[in-house]
């Protein structure tokens, strides 16, 4: 008999589930009516769909208003129509006193669906999951005061990771601003440094222009979050909207990057032809240029190391050219390549401290070429020998064209063989503990059973790093994780947003028990919306990364890293199966390695949401590890 416990009924599935016996009685769970299908049909990797969406926005020939041209309507209705005109068809909005007018207007929309999160932070993380997986801006709405404050982590996360996001907040009426009125917070001031831009709407006539500007800012150049704060009396005020108002962004428009000069691209290619040990160091800025990057690698034969945010921009399973992830928890061979390279091609990256370690020692033998769309990133942390401020996609297209016309013979086979020797000498590996389940093995199995094609979200901690190491992403926008901010609680709501943006896709939240419980309330949203989100819970009853750092840097002195019940430390606490059951979601627990494959297959075969609680040992560490501020010579394997 399979030794994993199961709670909940498994709905009938067109795909035959693995047969197993239930060692516990089955709890009958309530059935929920199926919600209307999402209108979003954007594939995680479909540029054509994204282009169609972009062309649909602001197009009078395709947009039809339900209002006659000269009919006054409320500011809230103008706001909702402005969203419709931008192609928005789903928002994540939680109502409150200062935003109820907007919610009432949403009920009058024929095209926008609201997904009601159970917490505003869940809503903004869901909007991020939607945006990260589709490339379209995610939209979230919250009320004033505490509702707006609950968006702060999500705004900072979107800014760090360059995610296009529009956050709309209700505000107290204009006459009450600055009086410490009930549920008043100065959200514009609070979020000024964690948004790309923000607005306080003081005139109803400005709504069409502000919304248009917000979408342009959120999606152009380096994407990011924009906040629009709308006082309640502005929402209630009636006006005839002017949809032809021009944007007022003269300074921003004057700094837009220009196409790269051919002479600059030829200079880079001369450096490539002169080098013996070149390495591509690619980041999140390459997610929209995956095809061009692959072609560049075909033409040059240069090996590719990816940042945490760039995973999937080049296929991780291409063992001839992919070095997988570099940095603090990157592979030995990726970090070796950077250490001994003579040319570092840094495309769409920001030389983050988790990649570079000690800046002076990073790529110290190499000439550095930095291409990025954001001029403020060039030279900020590491001074390049050659830099080009432009869209990476345009730069790659230009270099590919030059290479195809020249037909130069570039041979870096000897260098790749040297790196392959490092791969064989220092592969990603992990310990086994008898019948216990290594978390890395669980992720490897998931990769195998999904053929590396699932959309993966994570929380933050050890499980996040293991997912980055052991799941082999094939395409961009498969990997959704809080990178720069490192916000726990991200995984579950992000999976919710990804499932809505990508109907039919397999979406799995690989989470840790610490991160998962921070937004566990979104299980209710997932069930009510009937979203097929799978949760692979790596449950070691600890804050694993904190415990690991305690072991390495604090003489293993334990300080609040245990999450279980001190009175009964051997028990699994809290019981995640009961949380799932309370929301009507099937769930199972697996404790033995030999049962894991069947358990994961059952999770994948079960229609709708499913939670698989994988009980793991807590003693393992994420390796390799380059300590913070360290160098390649300090790597722990």
From Swiss-Prot:
Pathway: Amino-acid biosynthesis; L-isoleucine biosynthesis; L-isoleucine from 2-oxobutanoate: step 1/4; Amino-acid biosynthesis; L-valine biosynthesis; L-valine from pyruvate: step 1/4
Keywords on record: Amino-acid biosynthesis, Branched-chain amino acid biosynthesis, Chloroplast, FAD, Flavoprotein, Herbicide resistance, Magnesium, Metal-binding, Plastid, Thiamine pyrophosphate, Transferase, Transit peptide
Highest taxon above the source species: Eukaryota
GO terms assigned for molecular function: acetolactate synthase activity; flavin adenine dinucleotide binding; magnesium ion binding; thiamine pyrophosphate binding
Binding site for Mg(2+): 513, 540
Family statement: Belongs to the TPP enzyme family.
Protein name in the entry: Acetolactate synthase 2, chloroplastic
Organism this protein belongs to: Brassica napus (Rape)
